[in-house]
Amino acid sequence: PVFEAIKFFERGGVNIAVIGQHFPYTPISNPKYMVEGWSFGIRPEVIQKNINKAKKKGAEVVVLLSHNGFDVDQKLALTLQDLDVILTGHTHDAIPEAININNTLLLSSGSHGKYIGRIDLDIKKGKVVDYASKLIPIFSDVINPDPEMTEHINKLRQPYEQECNRVLGKADTLLYRRGNFNGTWDDVICDAIMIERDTE
């Protein structure tokens, strides 16, 4: 593995293991030179070994932080044992409340920072006995930016500021991108491809 598969945390007196699961289709969704020599896959048997290892090391709660996608992780939940939570991504689904599949809670928090997913677990004797979950909408115009993070971003951006501010063209309408749904920005890109390739 390139990265450690398991990280341990203690919250509220409970030992929590978080297992990472990378996007399994990386080799077919990215140029080969970017992932040369690496292999990717869903690999439920490897995830199960990591769950077992986490439990042996004293984890009371095991969380899978996954980029498989909501549909894949629903199927995965049916095959794994002793997995408490899957925080799933990639498919950008915004699920209002966690769903329970095979005693594994799945939560998907949308995309592009529109929501923060929150799940509260009631743990008794190393078992999840109850839970509450929700999506918290993020309204960027009412949240004050973190000054330290703003300074860090500005510092990273500074060498490229002139290039980032170069005008490439002007639009008569607002260009936006929604994430799950098409927006005007998507239309511009698709129209440009069709014009360039002379397609319908």
What are the functions of these language-model segments?
Residues 1-158, 180-192:
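Acidic, metal/ion-coordinating pockets
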Residues 62-65, 162-170, 200:
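Flexible, glycine/charged-enriched surface loops at secondary-structure junctions
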Residues 152-159, 163, 174, 196:
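Residues that form generic nucleotide/phosphate-binding pockets
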Residues 163-184:
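Glycine-rich phosphate/diphosphate-binding loops and the adjacent beta-loop-alpha structural elements
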Residues 192, 196-200:
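Glycine-rich, aromatic-lined ligand/substrate-binding cores of catalytic
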